[in-house]
Design a protein with these regions (language model features):
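Short secondary-structure transition/capping segments
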Residues: 149-156, 178-190, 210-216, 286-293, ...
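Extended, hydrophobic interaction surfaces within ordered domains
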Residues: 35-53, 269-271, 275-288, 301, ...
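A broadly tuned preference for mixed-charge, low-complexity surface segments
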Residues: 156-165, 189-193, 255-271, 320-337
């Protein structure tokens, strides 16, 4: 995951990044605190427990920090001086391609799809292309608050908004058959994206916009670095207008618009569904209800009986620690380590960390006075990334073209297209 800046007094004083149930907080002098969460409100600093990057439970089960936290390069600087100069550059690059076309943005309400939508709304005024935001609401798992925010953004930008949703009967069927989406198998993603692609095809759109950025995740870095080197904003029918933006570019733009998502103000790193398996434990107490909690409870009880109970995990542990986010094997390891860390905290042997203190770190970049960091050219940024790749080759290329490990999954989601219009 991409490290976010910790801002205090108009200065960047460090970074914070979370992955799975770890959070890593670093200062600018190399100081580092690795936090492991054992509940939605409590965690502990576990650096002294680390053995070769792992935290072990007494029974030998362990969780590996590097396996669960992909720490991407920290970019506490801007990649362009101001929005007008970037717009001028973008129009020069894509003007001939976009003029008179239909462009669709898959809009989630998050910061990255917001800035992509904003810069294209400005470009559309100059180039005369049709811009449409398409928001796919996830039934049962996503709060209605996000829908309201998406509508607010579209109104502010003066852009047409189309709302779509996967069929509720199919989504409900998947929930009971497959359990809630979990890490490594988010069947929800296909069901969410399919209505957007169908709309794109229905209206004969020319380009589909992604707000993905280069250093958000390792997977996206591998996919986008070649395009960054080539300066390639358009690839086939895909348009990536902001994929080289840094986190500082994004925050500056979002705050200038006054369109900060409520989740960011609650201290959440990402805008996602209330039941997203990629949330960290500390995020759940600041997450909005969906109104379908009784239904989800039934789903959770079923999958607990089928796949997790035999792993020695209690129902309370499964529910309170949101262990459905993991495969049963991974959940067993996490639960053992969490129990061990919690006991050490109760004995006073580890420093306890409250979830509210980490949420406050994430919130700072949305409310504190913003710093005025340096501006780096794309060539300078690419050179930094080249050095990072050279220093982290094993990590960057680990798992590339590796065989599937689906045997560790609790099951494999099956997308049955013929039932889509059910």
């Amino acid at each position: 995951m991409e490290p976010y800046p910790i801002i205090r007094g108009g200065k960047v004083v460090g970074s914070v990044v979370s992955g799975s149930d770890f959070t890593i907080v670093e200062d600018l002098h190399g100081g580092r605190r690795t936090i492991l969460w054992f509940s939605s409100e409590r965690g502990a600093v576990v650096d002294r427990l680390l053995v070769d990057g792992r935290v072990y439970a007494p029974n030998g089960l362990y969780v590996d920090v590097e396996q669960w936290v992909e720490v991407m390069p920290f970019q506490p600087y801007h990649s362009f001086s101001d929005i007008d100069s970037y717009l001028q550059w973008l129009v020069g690059v894509v003007g001939d391609v976009l003029r008179g076309k239909k462009v669709v943005v898959g809009f989630s309400g998050g910061k990255d799809s917001l800035v992509a939508s904003y810069i294209l709304s400005l470009a559309s005024e100059k180039l005369g292309f049709k811009l449409i935001l398409v928001y796919s609401h996830v039934p049962f798992l996503e709060s209605e608050e996000n829908r309201g925010f998406v509508e607010k953004v579209a109104n502010r930008l003066g852009v047409e908004l189309v709302e779509v949703e996967p069929p509720k009967p199919i989504f409900r069927e998947y929930m009971f058959r497959e359990g809630l989406p979990y890490r490594g198998t988010r069947w929800c993603t296909y069901l969410k994206v399919r209505p957007i692609r169908e709309f794109f095809k229905k209206i004969g759109a020319d380009y589909l916009v992604s707000g993905d950025r280069l250093v958000e995740t390792l997977k996206r870095f591998r996919r986008l670095i070649g395009a960054a080197v080539k300066g390639q904003i358009v690839a086939g029918k895909h348009l990536r207008p902001t994929f080289t933006w840094t986190i500082m570019d994004v925050v500056r733009c979002v705050r200038s618009l006054g369109l900060v998502h409520p989740d960011y103000l609650r201290g959440l790193p990402r805008v996602s569904c209330s039941w997203c398996p990629y949330k960290c434990l500390f995020e759940f107490t600041a997450t909005q209800a969906t109104g379908w909690e009784d239904l989800i409870e039934k789903v959770l009880r079923r999958e607990y009986r089928l796949w997790y109970q035999q792993r020695g995990i209690s129902w309370d542990e499964f529910r309170e620690r949101r262990l459905w986010r993991y495969t049963p094997k991974a959940a067993q390891a996490w639960n053992a380590v969490m129990n061990y860390v919690e006991k050490l905290v109760e004995k006073g042997e580890l420093e306890e960390v409250k979830a509210s203190s980490v949420r406050e770190l994430y919130k700072r970049m949305w409310v504190e006075e913003l710093p005025n960091p340096p501006v780096k050219t794309l060539d300078e940024i690419l050179e930094e990334l080249r050095k990072w790749v050279e220093a982290n080759r094993d990590k960057v290329f680990a798992g590339v073209n590796a065989p599937s490990t689906s045997s560790t999954h609790r099951h494999r989601a099956r997308i049955r297209a013929e039932k889509w219009n059910h």
